[in-house]
């Protein structure tokens, strides 16, 4: 595994160049501000709206996506996956010039062929492995978050060096930047989200909650045991792996972990995980998601509404009113 650090990157390669950050959401605001603090010239390309005003208030020169691409030598695409292909076709593609770099923080659109850059531009990825607010906060504290770097197309012969310069400007070489490929980053990211981090965990939490409530236990108690305490366990794993978590819990809980875990996540579960991975690798999920967006998201919207109306959510909303240390915004925001 090749990992790059501060001494392996030269942010000076971006001096005299302009970086266009396309999009000013979670990653956009963090990467743009970190780059600026590293002495890099940054412009923000967004359409008129809330993000336009926020970027302007943050002191950036804000312009249309087309103008930003024409202005910059490095173009970082930080729009949501489902918007990138359309914006690329409408405003980016015709404005690309020989020798420019097209950057991404997720490989979805390149790997699944939704964006096909011309052969005369570099195509690379710098993917911080943390949400935007953490990328920014840790940078301001003098540190950085780990990231992945990949080169899809090296038209100039310097693509990796420029990508590492960008990673250093964002602060990621302070922690370490691991070399990967667009394929590996995309497929593992989608699998992790679907099978473990989002799909797997939410299904497990709901199943546990429903098992307890159907067994006659009060929903409030079920919520505490199946969702609320999950953060305590995840934090222990996050800080020191499974061993640290097991060292920190009671022996009763640890024994229950050993004898029961494999009854919940069975060999059949793992077989299904492999089927999910195959669907991702073969592009079936990507096709499904692209078609879902083209159709106006009927399935997505219906499932989202049903999930939001689950008893677990209603009970949780009430119980969190008891928790003074939780400062959740009334309006949901992407971090």
Curated annotation (Swiss-Prot):
Keywords: Amino-acid biosynthesis, Branched-chain amino acid biosynthesis, Magnesium, Metal-binding, NADP, Oxidoreductase. GO terms for cellular component: cytosol. InterPro entries: 6-PGluconate_DH-like_C_sf, KARI, KARI_C, KARI_N, KARI_prok, NAD(P)-bd_dom_sf. One of its GO terms (biological process) is L-valine biosynthetic process. Pathway: Amino-acid biosynthesis; L-isoleucine biosynthesis; L-isoleucine from 2-oxobutanoate: step 2/4; Amino-acid biosynthesis; L-valine biosynthesis; L-valine from pyruvate: step 2/4. SUPFAM superfamilies: 6-phosphogluconate dehydrogenase C-terminal domain-like, NAD(P)-binding Rossmann-fold domains. Its EC number is 1.1.1.86. Residues 181-326 form the KARI C-terminal knotted domain. Belongs to the ketol-acid reductoisomerase family. This is Ketol-acid reductoisomerase (NADP(+)) 2. It comes from Bacillus anthracis.
């Amino acid at each position: 595994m090749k990992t790059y650090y501060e001494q392996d990157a030269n942010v000076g390669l971006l001096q005299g160049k302009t970086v266009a950050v396309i999009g000013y959401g979670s990653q956009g605001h963090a990467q743009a501000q970190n780059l600026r603090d590293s002495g890099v010239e940054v412009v923000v390309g967004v359409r008129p709206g809330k993000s336009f005003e926020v970027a302007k208030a943050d002191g950036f020169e804000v312009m249309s996506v087309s103008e930003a691409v024409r202005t910059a030598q490095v173009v970082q695409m930080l729009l949501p996956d489902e918007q990138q292909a359309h914006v690329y076709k409408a405003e980016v593609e015709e404005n690309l010039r020989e020798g420019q770099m097209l950057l991404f923080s997720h490989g979805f659109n390149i790997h699944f062929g939704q964006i096909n850059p011309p052969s005369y531009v570099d195509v690379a990825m710098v993917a911080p492995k943390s949400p935007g607010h953490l990328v920014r906060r840790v940078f301001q504290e003098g540190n950085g978050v780990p990231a992945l770097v990949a080169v899809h197309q090296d038209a100039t012969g310097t693509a990796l060096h420029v990508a590492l310069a960008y990673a250093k400007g964002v602060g990621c070489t302070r922690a370490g930047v691991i070399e990967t490929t667009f394929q590996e980053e995309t497929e593992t990211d989608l699998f992790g989200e679907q099978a473990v981090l989002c799909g797997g965990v939410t299904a497990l939490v709901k199943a546990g909650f429903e098992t307890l409530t159907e067994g006659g236990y009060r929903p409030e108690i079920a919520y505490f045991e199946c969702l609320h305490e999950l953060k305590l366990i995840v934090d222990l794993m996050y800080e020191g792996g499974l061993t640290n978590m097991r060292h920190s819990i009671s022996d009763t809980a640890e024994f229950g972990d050993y004898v029961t875990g494999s009854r919940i996540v069975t060999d059949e579960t793992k077989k299904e995980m492999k089927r999910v991975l195959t669907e991702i690798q073969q592009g079936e999920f990507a096709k499904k998601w692209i078609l879902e967006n083209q159709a106006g998201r009927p399935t997505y919207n219906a499932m989202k509404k049903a999930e939001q109306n689950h008893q677990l959510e209603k009970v949780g909303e009430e119980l969190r009113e008891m928790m003074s240390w939780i400062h959740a915004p009334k309006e949901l925001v992407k971090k």
